[in-house]
Amino acid sequence: MIPYTIILYTPQELNHSSYIQTGLFELKRLGIIDLKIKISAKKRLGRIIVSDTGEITETKQAHPKTSFYKLIDNIDKSEVFFACDLYDFANHFSKEALEKCDFIFKRSYDHNYLETLPKEYKNKVYPLGLTFGVHSNDKEESYKFLIGLFLSNVNVSFKPDRNLFKRLKKTVVSQKRHWE
């Protein structure tokens, strides 16, 4: 008997979630898990957005880059409902995942945005894994890489208006954090 079954609820978006599903199909192929697909056409509306100042807003927008799963222990029959939030923005959260899931694994994880969320929500959110902040200690010509990274991001954020210096500072801080 295979000890675990995962129910994969069909996602609203496949571009980001394909590597999660591919991994599950491979685990099934190896006989490590049983995998069942459940068709889900549910809209899953609702986003919770945390601003840089900590203000929380809710919208009725869909959060299609969040995929949902159920893990079943076939021995003791316990179940865990979880989601993988593969959205690019660390400050956007799926309302449905926060309300209904036991665990949420977030690709763009930043604990600073979690601090503002209610305790029952923030205790559910974990980093997805090696998706950001991964680097080699053997960085050949690292100064070129860092300069190119900085210049391309300054170019993207450059807009001559009253927030120019604020954006440039944010870019420098962000790139330094990602580099370290």
Can you name each region flagged by the protein language model?
Residues 75-180:
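Catalytic core of nucleotide-activated saccharide and alditol-phosphate transferases
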